[in-house]
Amino acid sequence: MEYSIIHLSDLHRIKPENIECIMSSFEIEKARYAEMGLPPVQLIVVSGDIVDGSKEKDAFVAKQQIEQQYETATKFLSDLCKLFIGPKQEDRARVVIVPGNHDVSQYISERSMEQIEHDDNEIEKLADALWSDKEEGADIRWSWKTLHFNRIVDRKTYNKRFDDFISFYNTFFSGIRKFPKDPERQSYLIDIPDLNIALACFNSCYQLDHLRLSGYISPRSLSALTSDLIKAKNNGRLIVGVWHHHTRGLPNQSNYLDYTILDNMVQNGIFVALHGHQHISGMINEHKDVSSDAKLNLISAGTVYGNKRDIPPAISRQYNILVVDMNSEECSIELYSREDATALNEMPAWDRGTIGRSLKTSHKITIPITPHLVLEEEEKLQNDINQINLQIEKSGNLESGIDQLIALGMEKPLVRKFVLEMLQRTDNHIRMIQLFSDPQNIAEAMAIFESSIRNKDRSTLIKLMNLDIVKTTTDASIKSMVAEAKLVII
């Protein structure tokens, strides 16, 4: 099986009057793909920054500007889908979109914060909170523009800063999929059986706003996909991660991804991921799991229509073509960088581009594929769990549903995952402690820490802090919980 994927990122500055010229350039490209011997395009991936955003202080004007930008992006992406995939609404199922930092509506995040009035004695305390990973620092921000601390005072408003993006997303994919609203679980898996690929999509802008620029993927957004990722792996899928941020930056920068989540990505079978943000085409092996020799290959796309302000020196507009060649045991992915040969003219002239700062115009990697496993017992277990979940949703009786799940066997990871999720919807911290006092993974450790802290269960907290899974972790959330636990124990 062989097919091509178009990987775009950082649309930023496309205006209505630009669309005709851009689409003409892609019509020329489509004809050249055949000359280059590339297989047909079956997927379009857009890894964030659909719009440029607005810095207008007037919320009404800012919202109008952003909505106009999303209308333009919708027109461009619709035309691109028609050109390469098909003209029907259902053809948009082959388009994959995640948000970027420019998709955060600044006028909303500004409205959710207030400047903190403080005396000199409080500065050190506020600074410690700002740079700590404790819960108390989650709402503190620093503005270099005003040289003042700020605090999120309206979390409900703050959580609406992606509403403009979500409105665009849900309209574009009407009848196909919706973007998750829960900030801690903004992830979804797009499974495409006839291409034998599954795309694990994440919002890497968790807790990002106009004052906090660092990229971060909520661990809960990954844990929410665990069962889907296991199923995709057992079905022999190539699993591809998609998010916005790159993972490396200069010492004076902070606008890149917190890399601590990458180990979890590899453990979940994600060995290749697509991103943008740095405005340059590239490929790196960012993270390795020493125990299994597995590695995560990160592929970045440049900005498809930025201007001189957006583009690094000696680089022009760029996008990627990925050629996927798959058999039952392995998959090769060849990256072709395409670059605008003009001086940023209104109509790009695409040609061979470079990958990173090298002179290479293409590069191939090989990814192992898990053989398709026909696991009747596991499929039956999943069906049983689905039935119990349906009963819970109908009856609202969580405790009864939890009992039924436990009866399926707590030694089974899938059962444990769903029991944990159901218990987190209750306030039954005692039962949480009883069932998960020996956590098997980070998600369980987080939950048992939280319940033990709320219950002031010192003996369980001491036991947790001495577990290898806690002592050896680099997970910032666990470290934060350990710090809180120490305060309870004292």
What is the predicted role of each segment?
Residues 1-95, 105-106, 227-230, 234:
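N-terminal active-site segment of His-dependent metallophosphoesterases
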Residues 7-9, 42-49, 94-101, 239-244, ...:
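Active-site neighborhood of phospho(di)ester-bond hydrolases with catalytic His/Asp-centered motifs
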Residues 14-16, 51-55, 97, 101-108, ...:
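Active-site environment of divalent metal-dependent phosphoester hydrolases
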Residues 71-220:
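Extended active-site neighborhood of metal-dependent phosphoesterases/phosphodiesterases
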Residues 194, 251-328:
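Conserved beta-sheet core of the metallophosphoesterase superfamily
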Residues 206-272, 278, 283:
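Active-site-proximal segments of metal-dependent phosphoesterases and phosphodiesterases across multiple
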Residues 323-413:
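A short C-terminal boundary segment appended to hydrolase-like catalytic domains
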Residues 398-408, 429-441, 461-473:
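Alpha-helical repeat scaffolds
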